[in-house]
């Protein structure tokens, strides 16, 4: 019989619903508890999905929980994942792994040191389209790829997200939040980047998040 991993979720915000909806299709892990710095959010989530509500410290100390799902805001991914690894648990984090490259490398090194697994979204490159493209490239059916181009445009996170404020803070924004989907796909198809450059533009100095 396959082992069923007991998972604790930290961060009961907007994206948590997607994970709860999707995890019912898997038989090798089960979300059994949730935590949030906003205790009311954790209690609401626990009631909705019939699981335990805990504090962050409680969920990290629970010996029955082997894996933590880190769904906090991007600015907190590094600190929360580090606490999880130091608590002796495996961690899967929403993207990005960290908002700074060196901190991401530190987490990977810490996981190796403690012989724990660390995983990170996005997993969308494993979808049918991405895998078919990789198959065509790896088989040399379409020749050597010289250029990859990915474009993402939408009216703004404030149009759908209940709490978009973190997008407008330091270490937030579309490159950090949405960029990983496209960077991950391009790296998976074409290999690691040898050189990176960037350019930004601020269209409006003042934005209204909610009216």
Q: Can you annotate each of these PLM segments?
A:
Residues 1-49:
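N-terminal Rossmann-like dinucleotide-binding module
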Residues 33, 66-67, 147:
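Short, Asp-centered acidic motifs that coordinate Mg2+ and/or phosphate
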Residues 66-67, 73-74, 78-125, 140:
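Beta-strand-loop-alpha-helix segment that lines the small-molecule cofactor/substrate pocket
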Residues 54, 92, 117-119, 149, ...:
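Structural detector of well-ordered beta-strand residues that form the stable sheet scaffold
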Residues 71-72, 152:
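Glycine-rich, N-terminal phosphate-binding loop of Rossmann-like dinucleotide-binding domains
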Residues 124-208:
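Predominantly a Rossmann-like dinucleotide-binding segment in NAD(P)-dependent oxidoreductases
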Residues 50-58:
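Conserved SAM-binding strand-loop segment of SAM-dependent methyltransferases
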């Amino acid at each position: 019989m396959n082992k069923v991993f007991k998972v604790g979720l930290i961060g009961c915000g907007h994206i948590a619903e997607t994970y709860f909806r999707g995890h019912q299709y898997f038989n090798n892990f089960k979300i059994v508890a949730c935590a949030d710095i906003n205790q009311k959010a954790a209690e609401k989530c626990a009631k909705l999905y019939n699981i335990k509500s805990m504090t962050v410290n409680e969920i990290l100390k629970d010996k029955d929980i082997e894996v933590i799902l880190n769904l906090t805001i991007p600015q907190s991914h590094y600190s929360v994942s580090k606490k999880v690894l130091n608590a002796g648990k495996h961690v899967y984090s929403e993207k990005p792994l960290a908002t700074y490259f060196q901190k991401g490398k530190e987490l990977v090194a810490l996981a190796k040191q403690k012989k724990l697994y660390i995983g990170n979204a996005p997993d969308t490159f494993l979808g049918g389209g991405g895998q078919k493209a990789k198959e065509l490239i790896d088989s040399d059916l379409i020749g050597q790829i010289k250029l990859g181009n990915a474009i993402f445009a939408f009216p703004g996170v404030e149009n759908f997200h209940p709490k978009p404020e973190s997008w407008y803070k330091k270490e937030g924004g579309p490159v950090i939040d949405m960029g990983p989907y496209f960077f991950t796909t391009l790296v998976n198809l074409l290999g690691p980047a040898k050189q990176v450059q960037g350019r930004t533009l601020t269209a409006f100095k003042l934005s209204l998040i909610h009216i």
